[in-house]
Curated annotation (Swiss-Prot):
Record protein name field: HTH-type transcriptional regulator BetI
DNA-binding region per Swiss-Prot/TrEMBL record: 31-50
Keywords per UniProt: DNA-binding, Repressor, Transcription, Transcription regulation
TM region(s), chain numbering: none
Residue span(s) of domain HTH tetR-type: 8-68
A biological-process GO annotation: glycine betaine biosynthetic process from choline
Function: Repressor involved in the biosynthesis of the osmoprotectant glycine betaine. It represses transcription of the choline transporter BetT and the genes of BetAB involved in the synthesis of glycine betaine.
Length: 194
């Protein structure tokens, strides 16, 4: 009989091993066997929990997305209630330590690439995109007319993605201070234009 709570412990262990495998070998080099090796368990156990490599990547991305959503909620809750502060909190969540660690950044890049070919991953990406846009739009709408708020949300979402992507591809740690400053300046510009 399995130990109580072991399933979640084992899944977390395997997701961590998947992140490390993608970091070290890329998505093509990540297999059920490479994940099992990093987790010091049998390939059969990985298969038991996730089925196949696609199931493993989906579970890993769900974990990364939960971390992003948790960071967003935590930072928005802690921010002052004005739109500028809450927008800055949303931006900061996208550059949270849970999102800029090398294994996570490489997993995001692999996920984006795979989401163009896998319907489930595409759906996850679509949900993430809509959630970011909705959160940004809700805050901009407190200070801007609805149409302008939607446009501002699209622009800021593109800036967040672009800053994050450039940072991820730079080959070293993301300069979060510089990225946040650019995003904050953009927010200030948009809110001042009204």
């Amino acid at each position: 009989m399995p130990k109580v709570g072991m399933r979640e412990i084992r899944r977390a262990q395997l997701i961590d091993a998947t992140l490390r495998s993608i970091d070290e070998a890329g998505l093509p080099g990540t297999t059920l066997a490479s994940v099992a090796q990093r987790a010091n368990i049998s390939t059969g156990i990985v298969s038991h929990y996730f089925g196949d490599k696609d199931g493993l990547l989906e579970a890993t991305m769900r974990h990364v997305l939960r971390d992003l959503w948790s960071a967003t909620t935590r930072r928005r809750t802690a921010a002052r209630k004005d739109p500028r502060s809450r927008l800055r909190a949303i931006v900061a969540a996208n550059f949270d330590d849970t999102q800029i660690a090398a294994p996570v950044m490489k997993t995001w890049l692999a996920f984006w690439s795979q989401s163009m070919h896998d319907p489930m991953l595409k759906r996850l990406q679509h949900v993430n995109t809509r959630r970011l846009h909705s959160n940004l739009c809700a805050e901009f709408a407190k200070a801007l007319p609805r149409a302008k708020a939607r446009e501002a949300a699209s622009g800021l979402a593109a800036l967040i993605d672009g800053l994050w992507l450039r940072g991820a591809l730079a080959g070293g740690p993301i300069d979060t201070r510089a990225a946040l400053k650019l995003a904050h300046d953009y927010i200030d510009l948009l809110l001042a234009s009204d």
